[in-house]
A protein has these predicted regions:
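Transmembrane and membrane-interface helices of multi-pass
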Residues: 1-141
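Long, structured stretches of catalytic cores involved in phosphate-ester chemistry, encompassing
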Residues: 363-365, 387, 433
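A long, amphipathic alpha-helix that forms part
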Residues: 28, 152-166, 302-306, 340-383
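Membrane-interface soluble catalytic domains
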Residues: 1, 9-17, 32-40, 50, ...
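Short beta-strand segments
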Residues: 258-260, 316-323, 353-359, 382-387, ...
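Short glycine/proline-rich turn/loop motifs
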Residues: 227, 340-348, 420-424
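Histidine-centered active-site microenvironments of extracellular/periplasmic hydrolases
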Residues: 194-198, 377-421
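Active-site-proximal alpha/beta segments of enzymes that process anionic O-linked groups
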Residues: 134-339, 413, 435-467, 472-475, ...
Protein backbone atom coordinates (compact mmCIF):
# COMPACT_ATOMS: atom_id res chain seq x y z
CA UNK A 1 0.00 0.00 0.00
CA UNK A 2 2.96 2.29 0.65
CA UNK A 3 4.03 2.04 -2.99
CA UNK A 4 0.46 2.68 -4.20
CA UNK A 5 0.28 5.86 -2.10
CA UNK A 6 3.69 6.93 -3.42
CA UNK A 7 2.54 6.34 -7.01
CA UNK A 8 -0.67 8.33 -6.44
CA UNK A 9 1.23 11.38 -5.22
CA UNK A 10 3.89 11.13 -7.91
CA UNK A 11 1.24 10.89 -10.64
CA UNK A 12 -0.63 13.86 -9.18
CA UNK A 13 2.48 16.01 -9.40
CA UNK A 14 2.79 16.24 -5.60
CA UNK A 15 6.19 15.69 -4.00
CA UNK A 16 6.13 12.03 -2.85
CA UNK A 17 8.08 12.68 0.34
CA UNK A 18 7.85 10.09 3.09
CA UNK A 19 5.71 12.50 5.07
CA UNK A 20 3.19 13.04 2.29
CA UNK A 21 3.10 9.32 1.53
CA UNK A 22 2.34 8.44 5.16
CA UNK A 23 -0.37 11.12 5.36
CA UNK A 24 -2.14 9.67 2.34
CA UNK A 25 -1.58 6.16 3.66
CA UNK A 26 -3.15 7.09 7.00
CA UNK A 27 -6.19 8.54 5.24
CA UNK A 28 -6.69 5.43 3.11
CA UNK A 29 -6.14 3.01 6.03
CA UNK A 30 -8.68 4.74 8.27
CA UNK A 31 -11.34 5.22 5.60
CA UNK A 32 -10.95 1.70 4.22
CA UNK A 33 -11.93 0.34 7.63
CA UNK A 34 -15.50 1.32 6.74
CA UNK A 35 -17.19 -0.27 3.73
CA UNK A 36 -19.23 2.88 3.02
CA UNK A 37 -16.24 5.18 3.47
CA UNK A 38 -14.25 3.01 1.07
CA UNK A 39 -16.84 3.11 -1.70
CA UNK A 40 -17.99 6.70 -1.24
CA UNK A 41 -14.66 8.36 -0.38
CA UNK A 42 -11.56 6.25 -1.05
CA UNK A 43 -12.68 4.76 -4.35
CA UNK A 44 -13.84 8.08 -5.94
CA UNK A 45 -10.72 9.86 -4.67
CA UNK A 46 -8.35 7.23 -6.06
CA UNK A 47 -10.32 7.07 -9.31
CA UNK A 48 -9.78 10.80 -9.85
CA UNK A 49 -6.11 10.43 -9.03
CA UNK A 50 -5.79 7.53 -11.46
CA UNK A 51 -7.59 9.35 -14.30
CA UNK A 52 -5.20 12.29 -14.00
CA UNK A 53 -2.09 10.15 -13.47
CA UNK A 54 -0.99 9.76 -17.14
CA UNK A 55 -0.94 13.56 -17.42
CA UNK A 56 0.17 14.46 -13.89
CA UNK A 57 3.32 12.35 -14.04
CA UNK A 58 4.52 14.69 -16.83
CA UNK A 59 2.84 18.05 -16.21
CA UNK A 60 2.46 18.11 -12.45
CA UNK A 61 -0.61 19.23 -10.48
CA UNK A 62 -3.41 21.21 -12.16
CA UNK A 63 -3.22 24.99 -11.94
CA UNK A 64 -4.89 28.00 -13.52
CA UNK A 65 -2.76 27.86 -16.66
CA UNK A 66 -3.47 24.19 -17.38
CA UNK A 67 -7.19 24.42 -16.62
CA UNK A 68 -7.50 27.55 -18.78
CA UNK A 69 -5.72 25.72 -21.58
CA UNK A 70 -8.28 22.90 -21.40
CA UNK A 71 -11.13 25.38 -21.86
CA UNK A 72 -9.26 26.95 -24.78
CA UNK A 73 -8.40 23.66 -26.50
CA UNK A 74 -10.24 22.15 -29.45
CA UNK A 75 -10.78 18.48 -30.30
CA UNK A 76 -7.72 18.25 -32.53
CA UNK A 77 -5.41 19.55 -29.81
CA UNK A 78 -6.89 17.12 -27.26
CA UNK A 79 -6.37 14.25 -29.69
CA UNK A 80 -2.78 15.31 -30.36
CA UNK A 81 -2.13 15.76 -26.65
CA UNK A 82 -3.37 12.27 -25.74
CA UNK A 83 -1.48 10.54 -28.54
CA UNK A 84 1.80 12.08 -27.39
CA UNK A 85 1.52 10.79 -23.82
CA UNK A 86 3.83 7.74 -23.47
CA UNK A 87 1.97 4.42 -23.59
CA UNK A 88 3.45 3.37 -20.26
CA UNK A 89 1.68 6.29 -18.55
CA UNK A 90 -1.70 4.72 -19.29
CA UNK A 91 -0.79 1.76 -17.07
CA UNK A 92 -0.58 3.96 -13.97
CA UNK A 93 -4.39 4.08 -13.47
CA UNK A 94 -4.43 0.27 -13.52
CA UNK A 95 -1.65 0.08 -10.92
CA UNK A 96 -3.37 2.61 -8.64
CA UNK A 97 -6.83 1.04 -8.73
CA UNK A 98 -5.39 -2.49 -8.46
CA UNK A 99 -3.32 -1.49 -5.43
CA UNK A 100 -6.35 -0.04 -3.66
CA UNK A 101 -8.52 -3.10 -4.33
CA UNK A 102 -5.77 -5.55 -3.34
CA UNK A 103 -5.37 -3.72 -0.04
CA UNK A 104 -9.13 -3.73 0.55
CA UNK A 105 -9.33 -7.42 -0.32
CA UNK A 106 -6.44 -8.27 2.02
CA UNK A 107 -7.82 -6.54 5.13
CA UNK A 108 -11.35 -7.88 4.58
CA UNK A 109 -10.18 -11.44 4.00
CA UNK A 110 -7.93 -11.40 7.07
CA UNK A 111 -10.42 -9.44 9.19
CA UNK A 112 -7.84 -6.75 10.01
CA UNK A 113 -9.43 -3.85 11.93
CA UNK A 114 -6.88 -1.09 12.40
CA UNK A 115 -9.45 1.24 13.93
CA UNK A 116 -9.60 -0.92 17.09
CA UNK A 117 -5.92 -0.31 17.82
CA UNK A 118 -6.09 2.91 19.87
CA UNK A 119 -2.32 3.33 20.04
CA UNK A 120 -2.03 3.16 16.27
CA UNK A 121 -4.90 5.62 15.84
CA UNK A 122 -3.25 8.04 18.29
CA UNK A 123 0.01 7.89 16.33
CA UNK A 124 -1.93 8.53 13.13
CA UNK A 125 -3.66 11.58 14.60
CA UNK A 126 -0.46 13.10 15.99
CA UNK A 127 1.39 12.56 12.73
CA UNK A 128 -1.47 14.04 10.72
CA UNK A 129 -1.67 17.17 12.84
CA UNK A 130 1.80 18.31 11.74
CA UNK A 131 0.50 20.33 8.79
CA UNK A 132 0.57 19.07 5.16
CA UNK A 133 -2.37 17.41 3.51
CA UNK A 134 -2.83 14.59 0.98
CA UNK A 135 -5.83 16.56 -0.24
CA UNK A 136 -3.56 19.22 -1.75
CA UNK A 137 -4.17 17.83 -5.25
CA UNK A 138 -7.92 18.36 -4.90
CA UNK A 139 -7.53 21.79 -3.30
CA UNK A 140 -5.32 22.98 -6.17
CA UNK A 141 -7.60 21.44 -8.80
CA UNK A 142 -10.82 22.87 -7.38
CA UNK A 143 -9.27 26.30 -6.85
CA UNK A 144 -7.96 26.37 -10.42
CA UNK A 145 -11.25 25.21 -11.93
CA UNK A 146 -13.23 27.79 -9.95
CA UNK A 147 -10.83 30.56 -10.94
CA UNK A 148 -11.11 29.70 -14.63
CA UNK A 149 -14.87 29.14 -14.40
CA UNK A 150 -15.40 32.51 -12.73
CA UNK A 151 -13.34 34.23 -15.42
CA UNK A 152 -15.32 32.51 -18.18
CA UNK A 153 -18.61 33.54 -16.55
CA UNK A 154 -17.38 37.12 -16.46
CA UNK A 155 -16.29 36.98 -20.10
CA UNK A 156 -19.59 35.52 -21.29
CA UNK A 157 -22.04 37.48 -19.16
CA UNK A 158 -20.98 41.08 -19.25
CA UNK A 159 -20.70 43.33 -22.22
CA UNK A 160 -17.13 44.41 -21.70
CA UNK A 161 -17.46 48.10 -22.36
CA UNK A 162 -14.26 49.92 -23.12
CA UNK A 163 -12.85 52.25 -20.48
CA UNK A 164 -10.23 53.77 -22.77
CA UNK A 165 -12.34 56.78 -23.70
CA UNK A 166 -11.20 58.71 -26.77
CA UNK A 167 -7.71 58.29 -28.18
CA UNK A 168 -5.95 60.22 -30.90
CA UNK A 169 -3.07 59.52 -33.24
CA UNK A 170 0.26 61.30 -33.11
CA UNK A 171 3.17 60.44 -35.40
CA UNK A 172 1.33 57.37 -36.70
CA UNK A 173 3.53 56.71 -39.74
CA UNK A 174 2.00 53.69 -41.45
CA UNK A 175 -1.21 52.72 -43.21
CA UNK A 176 -1.07 49.12 -42.02
CA UNK A 177 0.09 47.79 -38.66
CA UNK A 178 0.45 44.00 -38.53
CA UNK A 179 0.96 42.26 -35.18
CA UNK A 180 2.04 38.63 -35.63
CA UNK A 181 1.71 36.45 -32.52
CA UNK A 182 3.94 33.38 -32.60
CA UNK A 183 3.17 30.30 -30.53
CA UNK A 184 5.42 28.59 -27.95
CA UNK A 185 8.57 29.96 -29.62
CA UNK A 186 11.39 30.20 -27.09
CA UNK A 187 13.83 33.01 -27.81
CA UNK A 188 17.04 30.99 -27.49
CA UNK A 189 15.88 28.54 -30.17
CA UNK A 190 15.91 31.34 -32.79
CA UNK A 191 19.13 31.80 -34.78
CA UNK A 192 18.43 35.55 -34.72
CA UNK A 193 18.86 35.36 -30.93
CA UNK A 194 21.92 33.11 -30.92
CA UNK A 195 20.86 29.54 -31.76
CA UNK A 196 23.66 27.90 -33.82
CA UNK A 197 21.46 26.47 -36.60
CA UNK A 198 20.12 29.16 -38.94
CA UNK A 199 16.38 28.57 -38.65
CA UNK A 200 15.51 32.29 -38.91
CA UNK A 201 17.18 33.60 -42.09
CA UNK A 202 14.60 36.39 -42.41
CA UNK A 203 14.75 37.70 -38.84
CA UNK A 204 18.52 37.20 -38.75
CA UNK A 205 19.26 39.42 -41.73
CA UNK A 206 16.33 41.64 -42.68
CA UNK A 207 16.34 45.36 -41.95
CA UNK A 208 14.42 46.25 -38.82
CA UNK A 209 14.78 46.19 -35.03
CA UNK A 210 15.47 43.03 -33.04
CA UNK A 211 14.75 43.34 -29.31
CA UNK A 212 16.57 40.83 -27.11
CA UNK A 213 15.00 40.94 -23.66
CA UNK A 214 11.19 40.71 -23.89
CA UNK A 215 9.52 38.51 -21.26
CA UNK A 216 6.06 36.99 -21.57
CA UNK A 217 3.09 37.54 -19.29
CA UNK A 218 2.75 33.84 -18.46
CA UNK A 219 3.91 30.32 -19.23
CA UNK A 220 1.17 29.42 -21.72
CA UNK A 221 -1.04 31.14 -24.29
CA UNK A 222 -4.01 32.06 -22.10
CA UNK A 223 -2.09 33.07 -18.97
CA UNK A 224 0.30 35.20 -21.03
CA UNK A 225 -1.87 36.91 -23.63
CA UNK A 226 -4.68 37.83 -21.23
CA UNK A 227 -2.09 40.08 -19.54
CA UNK A 228 -0.18 41.22 -22.62
CA UNK A 229 -3.30 42.13 -24.62
CA UNK A 230 -4.98 44.09 -21.82
CA UNK A 231 -3.78 46.84 -19.50
CA UNK A 232 -3.26 44.56 -16.48
CA UNK A 233 -3.18 44.94 -12.73
CA UNK A 234 0.61 44.93 -12.30
CA UNK A 235 0.54 44.10 -8.59
CA UNK A 236 -1.70 41.03 -8.80
CA UNK A 237 -0.98 39.99 -12.41
CA UNK A 238 -4.68 40.14 -13.33
CA UNK A 239 -6.12 41.17 -16.72
CA UNK A 240 -8.55 44.05 -17.23
CA UNK A 241 -11.01 43.20 -20.00
CA UNK A 242 -12.31 46.78 -19.98
CA UNK A 243 -8.90 47.88 -21.26
CA UNK A 244 -8.08 45.55 -24.16
CA UNK A 245 -5.67 46.15 -27.00
CA UNK A 246 -8.43 45.92 -29.61
CA UNK A 247 -10.57 48.49 -27.80
CA UNK A 248 -7.57 50.82 -27.55
CA UNK A 249 -6.91 50.66 -31.29
CA UNK A 250 -10.60 51.13 -32.10
CA UNK A 251 -10.72 54.17 -29.82
CA UNK A 252 -8.26 55.78 -32.24
CA UNK A 253 -10.61 55.08 -35.19
CA UNK A 254 -8.43 52.38 -36.74
CA UNK A 255 -10.12 49.40 -38.40
CA UNK A 256 -9.25 46.18 -36.54
CA UNK A 257 -8.82 42.64 -37.88
CA UNK A 258 -8.09 39.36 -36.11
CA UNK A 259 -6.90 36.36 -38.16
CA UNK A 260 -6.15 33.15 -36.30
CA UNK A 261 -5.03 29.57 -36.67
CA UNK A 262 -5.64 29.04 -32.96
CA UNK A 263 -9.11 27.55 -32.86
CA UNK A 264 -12.70 28.66 -33.19
CA UNK A 265 -15.36 30.37 -31.14
CA UNK A 266 -17.09 27.77 -28.99
CA UNK A 267 -19.86 27.88 -26.43
CA UNK A 268 -17.48 29.51 -23.97
CA UNK A 269 -15.30 32.50 -24.68
CA UNK A 270 -11.70 32.09 -23.63
CA UNK A 271 -9.85 35.23 -22.57
CA UNK A 272 -8.16 35.38 -25.98
CA UNK A 273 -11.30 34.80 -28.06
CA UNK A 274 -13.14 37.39 -25.96
CA UNK A 275 -10.50 39.96 -26.93
CA UNK A 276 -10.53 38.79 -30.56
CA UNK A 277 -14.32 39.12 -30.80
CA UNK A 278 -14.02 42.85 -30.23
CA UNK A 279 -12.32 43.23 -33.62
CA UNK A 280 -14.26 44.68 -36.53
CA UNK A 281 -13.40 41.59 -38.57
CA UNK A 282 -12.64 38.05 -37.33
CA UNK A 283 -11.37 35.06 -39.29
CA UNK A 284 -10.52 31.70 -37.70
CA UNK A 285 -9.10 28.82 -39.73
CA UNK A 286 -10.24 26.24 -37.16
CA UNK A 287 -13.92 26.94 -37.49
CA UNK A 288 -16.63 24.85 -39.12
CA UNK A 289 -15.00 22.56 -41.70
CA UNK A 290 -11.56 23.16 -40.23
CA UNK A 291 -12.61 21.80 -36.85
CA UNK A 292 -10.64 18.57 -37.10
CA UNK A 293 -7.79 19.60 -39.42
CA UNK A 294 -4.17 20.32 -38.65
CA UNK A 295 -4.20 23.61 -40.56
CA UNK A 296 -1.04 25.35 -41.72
CA UNK A 297 -0.25 28.95 -40.81
CA UNK A 298 0.48 29.59 -44.50
CA UNK A 299 -3.27 29.44 -45.16
CA UNK A 300 -3.62 32.80 -43.41
CA UNK A 301 -1.54 34.58 -46.03
CA UNK A 302 -4.28 34.68 -48.69
CA UNK A 303 -6.74 36.18 -46.21
CA UNK A 304 -4.22 38.87 -45.23
CA UNK A 305 -3.64 39.70 -48.90
CA UNK A 306 -7.39 39.97 -49.45
CA UNK A 307 -7.77 42.41 -46.55
CA UNK A 308 -4.83 44.58 -47.64
CA UNK A 309 -6.07 44.81 -51.23
CA UNK A 310 -9.69 45.42 -50.25
CA UNK A 311 -9.39 48.96 -48.89
CA UNK A 312 -6.97 51.82 -48.31
CA UNK A 313 -8.21 52.66 -44.81
CA UNK A 314 -5.81 52.57 -41.86
CA UNK A 315 -5.72 49.03 -40.49
CA UNK A 316 -4.51 47.09 -37.45
CA UNK A 317 -4.23 43.37 -38.20
CA UNK A 318 -3.55 40.71 -35.56
CA UNK A 319 -2.29 37.40 -36.97
CA UNK A 320 -2.29 34.60 -34.38
CA UNK A 321 -0.19 31.65 -35.57
CA UNK A 322 -0.16 27.99 -34.52
CA UNK A 323 3.62 28.21 -34.83
CA UNK A 324 5.49 25.85 -32.51
CA UNK A 325 2.49 24.68 -30.49
CA UNK A 326 3.04 21.53 -28.43
CA UNK A 327 3.66 18.41 -30.53
CA UNK A 328 5.80 20.43 -32.90
CA UNK A 329 6.27 17.51 -35.30
CA UNK A 330 2.59 17.87 -36.21
CA UNK A 331 3.23 21.52 -37.05
CA UNK A 332 5.77 20.63 -39.74
CA UNK A 333 4.04 17.75 -41.51
CA UNK A 334 3.92 19.99 -44.59
CA UNK A 335 7.40 21.40 -44.06
CA UNK A 336 11.01 20.28 -44.37
CA UNK A 337 13.11 19.44 -41.33
CA UNK A 338 15.97 21.90 -41.05
CA UNK A 339 18.57 19.45 -39.70
CA UNK A 340 19.60 15.86 -40.37
CA UNK A 341 19.34 14.17 -36.99
CA UNK A 342 20.41 10.56 -36.53
CA UNK A 343 19.93 10.30 -32.78
CA UNK A 344 16.26 9.78 -31.88
CA UNK A 345 16.86 11.67 -28.64
CA UNK A 346 17.02 14.98 -30.55
CA UNK A 347 14.34 14.26 -33.17
CA UNK A 348 11.70 16.37 -31.44
CA UNK A 349 14.03 19.35 -31.08
CA UNK A 350 14.56 19.10 -34.85
CA UNK A 351 10.78 19.41 -35.29
CA UNK A 352 10.71 22.35 -32.88
CA UNK A 353 13.45 24.39 -34.55
CA UNK A 354 11.91 23.53 -37.93
CA UNK A 355 8.56 24.92 -36.78
CA UNK A 356 10.36 28.18 -35.89
CA UNK A 357 11.92 28.08 -39.36
CA UNK A 358 8.38 27.76 -40.77
CA UNK A 359 7.24 30.81 -38.79
CA UNK A 360 10.25 32.74 -40.06
CA UNK A 361 9.31 31.84 -43.64
CA UNK A 362 5.73 32.97 -42.92
CA UNK A 363 7.09 36.36 -41.84
CA UNK A 364 9.30 36.50 -44.92
CA UNK A 365 6.37 35.75 -47.26
CA UNK A 366 4.15 38.30 -45.51
CA UNK A 367 6.85 40.97 -45.61
CA UNK A 368 7.56 40.31 -49.31
CA UNK A 369 3.89 40.72 -50.16
CA UNK A 370 3.61 43.94 -48.15
CA UNK A 371 6.72 45.36 -49.85
CA UNK A 372 5.22 44.62 -53.28
CA UNK A 373 1.98 46.34 -52.27
CA UNK A 374 3.95 49.30 -50.99
CA UNK A 375 5.84 49.53 -54.31
CA UNK A 376 2.61 49.41 -56.31
CA UNK A 377 0.13 51.33 -54.18
CA UNK A 378 2.26 53.16 -51.59
CA UNK A 379 0.47 51.31 -48.78
CA UNK A 380 3.04 51.73 -46.02
CA UNK A 381 3.26 49.13 -43.26
CA UNK A 382 4.99 48.02 -40.10
CA UNK A 383 5.08 44.37 -39.01
CA UNK A 384 5.81 43.37 -35.41
CA UNK A 385 6.44 39.75 -34.39
CA UNK A 386 6.58 38.30 -30.90
CA UNK A 387 5.77 34.94 -29.29
CA UNK A 388 3.33 34.36 -26.44
CA UNK A 389 5.64 32.22 -24.27
CA UNK A 390 8.45 29.69 -24.29
CA UNK A 391 8.66 26.02 -23.27
CA UNK A 392 10.81 23.77 -21.09
CA UNK A 393 12.69 20.56 -21.86
CA UNK A 394 11.31 17.23 -20.70
CA UNK A 395 12.86 13.85 -21.53
CA UNK A 396 10.40 10.99 -22.01
CA UNK A 397 11.26 7.53 -23.33
CA UNK A 398 14.66 8.70 -24.46
CA UNK A 399 13.38 11.70 -26.45
CA UNK A 400 13.83 15.33 -25.39
CA UNK A 401 10.57 17.24 -25.82
CA UNK A 402 9.69 20.89 -25.27
CA UNK A 403 6.41 21.44 -23.44
CA UNK A 404 4.82 23.01 -20.35
CA UNK A 405 5.56 20.07 -18.05
CA UNK A 406 7.59 22.37 -15.81
CA UNK A 407 8.69 25.99 -15.55
CA UNK A 408 12.16 26.81 -16.81
CA UNK A 409 14.28 29.90 -16.18
CA UNK A 410 14.04 30.45 -19.95
CA UNK A 411 10.28 29.86 -20.13
CA UNK A 412 9.39 33.56 -20.21
CA UNK A 413 12.06 34.64 -22.72
CA UNK A 414 10.42 35.47 -26.05
CA UNK A 415 11.48 37.09 -29.36
CA UNK A 416 10.50 40.54 -30.63
CA UNK A 417 11.22 41.78 -34.15
CA UNK A 418 9.89 44.77 -36.10
CA UNK A 419 10.31 45.69 -39.74
CA UNK A 420 8.56 48.18 -41.99
CA UNK A 421 8.24 49.58 -45.49
CA UNK A 422 10.87 52.22 -44.71
CA UNK A 423 13.34 50.10 -42.72
CA UNK A 424 16.71 50.98 -44.24
CA UNK A 425 19.06 49.48 -41.64
CA UNK A 426 19.27 46.79 -39.00
CA UNK A 427 19.43 47.43 -35.26
CA UNK A 428 19.61 45.08 -32.27
CA UNK A 429 18.62 46.15 -28.75
CA UNK A 430 19.69 44.20 -25.67
CA UNK A 431 17.21 45.50 -23.12
CA UNK A 432 14.77 43.99 -20.64
CA UNK A 433 11.12 44.55 -21.58
CA UNK A 434 8.27 43.25 -19.42
CA UNK A 435 5.28 41.69 -21.15
CA UNK A 436 3.07 43.50 -18.64
CA UNK A 437 3.98 46.75 -20.39
CA UNK A 438 3.15 45.29 -23.79
CA UNK A 439 0.06 47.37 -24.48
CA UNK A 440 2.01 50.58 -23.80
CA UNK A 441 4.63 49.44 -26.30
CA UNK A 442 1.99 48.69 -28.94
CA UNK A 443 0.39 52.11 -28.42
CA UNK A 444 3.76 53.83 -28.95
CA UNK A 445 4.44 51.70 -32.04
CA UNK A 446 1.13 52.68 -33.64
CA UNK A 447 1.21 56.28 -32.40
CA UNK A 448 -1.85 56.13 -30.13
CA UNK A 449 -2.16 58.73 -27.39
CA UNK A 450 -4.39 57.99 -24.40
CA UNK A 451 -4.33 59.24 -20.81
CA UNK A 452 -4.08 55.66 -19.51
CA UNK A 453 -1.01 54.90 -21.62
CA UNK A 454 2.57 55.68 -20.63
CA UNK A 455 3.49 57.96 -23.52
CA UNK A 456 7.23 57.63 -22.83
CA UNK A 457 7.34 53.84 -23.08
CA UNK A 458 8.91 52.22 -26.14
CA UNK A 459 9.98 48.73 -27.19
CA UNK A 460 12.75 50.19 -29.29
CA UNK A 461 14.62 52.64 -27.02
CA UNK A 462 17.18 50.00 -25.98
CA UNK A 463 16.52 50.83 -22.31
CA UNK A 464 15.64 48.33 -19.57
CA UNK A 465 12.19 48.55 -18.02
CA UNK A 466 12.61 49.77 -14.43
CA UNK A 467 10.32 47.07 -13.00
CA UNK A 468 9.70 43.40 -13.79
CA UNK A 469 6.68 43.31 -11.43
CA UNK A 470 8.03 40.35 -9.50
CA UNK A 471 8.79 38.03 -12.43
CA UNK A 472 12.38 37.28 -11.42
CA UNK A 473 11.31 36.54 -7.84
CA UNK A 474 8.47 34.34 -9.10
CA UNK A 475 10.81 32.30 -11.29
CA UNK A 476 13.33 31.99 -8.44
CA UNK A 477 10.61 30.69 -6.11
CA UNK A 478 9.00 28.27 -8.55
CA UNK A 479 12.06 26.70 -10.17
CA UNK A 480 15.80 26.28 -10.07
CA UNK A 481 15.58 24.41 -13.36
CA UNK A 482 18.04 25.78 -15.91
CA UNK A 483 17.72 24.29 -19.39
CA UNK A 484 19.49 26.30 -22.08
CA UNK A 485 18.80 25.55 -25.74
CA UNK A 486 20.33 22.32 -27.02
CA UNK A 487 22.43 22.49 -30.16
CA UNK A 488 21.54 19.45 -32.30
CA UNK A 489 24.22 20.07 -34.92
CA UNK A 490 25.83 16.74 -35.80
CA UNK A 491 23.54 14.75 -33.49
Amino acid sequence: MFFTAKLILKCAGILPSERNIFLLLILIVILTSSKKAFWFLVFPMCTLYSIYSPIGIIYGPPNYSYVASVFATDFLEIKEFLTHIPIKNYFYPIFIISGIFLYRFFIVKNNIEFYKNKTLISIFVIFSMINQSPAEFFKITIRSILEVKNEIVVLNNFKSSSEWGRSHLENSKYDNYILVIGESARKDYHHAFGYPINNTPFMSSNNGILVNGLTSGGSNTVSSLRLMLTKPDFKNWKPNYHLTLIDLVKSADIKTYWLSNQGYFGYHDTPISAIAKKSDYKYFLKYGDFYSKNTSDFLLLDKIKEIIKKSKEKKFIVVHLYGSHSHACDRVIDYKKIANVRDKKYSYINCYISSINKTDEFLHKLNSFMMKEFSKNQGSYSMLYFADHGLAHNETDGVIYLNNSRVSKFHYDIPLFETSSDSSSRKECYSFKSGLNFIDGIAKWIGIKNEKINKNYSFFDCKDDPNDYGLRNYIAKTTDYTDPAIDISGK
